[in-house]
Every structure is written in C-alpha cells, then in structure tokens.
From Swiss-Prot:
This is Putative 3-methyladenine DNA glycosylase. GO terms for biological process: base-excision repair. The keyword Glycosyltransferase does not apply. Its EC number is 3.2.2.-. It holds the Pfam family Pur_DNA_glyco. Belongs to the DNA glycosylase MPG family. One of its GO terms (molecular function) is DNA binding. It comes from the Bacteria. Keywords: DNA damage, DNA repair, Hydrolase. It is an enzyme of class 3 (hydrolase). It comes from Lactobacillus acidophilus (strain ATCC 700396 / NCK56 / N2 / NCFM).
Amino acid sequence: MNYAEYFTNRSTDEITRDLIGRPLTFNDGQEKLGGYIVEAEAYMGKLDRAAHSYGGHRSPANEGLYRTGGTIYIYAQRQYFFFDVACQEENEPQGVLVRAIDPAWGIDSMIKNRNGKSGVLITNGPAKMMQAFGIHDKNWNLHFLSDSPFTIDLADNHKRIAQEIIADKRVGINQSDPIWANKKLRYYVAGNPYVSDMKKRDYASNNGWT
C-alpha cells in the first residue's frame, strides 16, 4: 500500500491507531535513525477544537494539513518542532501527530543529538523525538513522505504488535471545550516506557510488545 492510499482510505483516528507499532525512521545523510511508533494523536480537522485547522483556519504555518494525505506537516512551538502527517484528501485538514517512538536504529547518534540524554529520555515525547533525529527546523514541512528522508514502513510483517493499545485523551489540550479535550484520540502501547509521562510502576514486560 502506498502513502497516499494509507493516509486517506479510512478515518484519521483509525489511521492513528494503525500506526502504533510501525517503524518510523529518518535518514540524516549518515545513517538511519528511528524506532517503532508507540504513541500518536489524531486531529480531526475543522470541527476539532484542538486542531490547528479548527473552524477552517488556514495559513502558511498550517498549510501542510490541507495537502493530500501523506504530506509532512512540521510545526514549531518556541524552539521545539513536531512531526505530523496529513490525513484524508486535499483540503480536508486532518492529521496525526507522532508523539513517541521506541528506539531501534541509530540509538547512539540519537543520544548524541539529545546531548547525552539516554534511556526513555531519548524519544519519550514529540519534541524529544525530533531532537533525537537532529531536526531543528521546518525544512521538510510540506514534502510528501516518499520525497523526504522520513519513512513510515507500511509492511505489516515489519510492524511490532502491542499486547494492548490504549485509547485516551490527548495531551495538553485546552479544557475550554471539554468534549474535544476529553475525546479519546491518543493511542499508545500500554506499559511502553517511551510513551510520554508513562510511570515506572506501569512499565510492562518487553516494553508492552508481544
């Protein structure tokens, strides 16, 4: 299955859940960095008060969401950068935010990119993941996945299977609209230590994989 089909052929929350366990990698020109997606959030577009495209808001900053599914949308908050992929057809501005990966490739380089932070601190959050990839700009914003150094491996035989996938509310969402703030649109591997804010007491055997 190609990216255009994968990111448009079902609802955005279904796409987000299916991404759990798939390899996400970034080729920095020297080697492949990355790991298995363990946490991701769906943003449902114009009706979603937490989405950057809520109410049809469109600007150069969020243009990536309006492109066809499979387009990279990188946005910045202060000095931090976040990796999203647009979902659905062009002008239907939905997307998925990848929040965390379980490192598997280029771990030593990712630790170096994180200024020596190791263990769960390498990639247990969306900005940390981008730092681990050595990304400090929006250069790959608006590129289609297949035309970028990013790869999401869609081969099912390369996907790791979680013992349990949890659906929960998204992180850091404004509570002014409790309906959207509390929608269970964040998916993660139960007990995986790289999930943001996972408590040590909740760590699962084998990081939550089967």
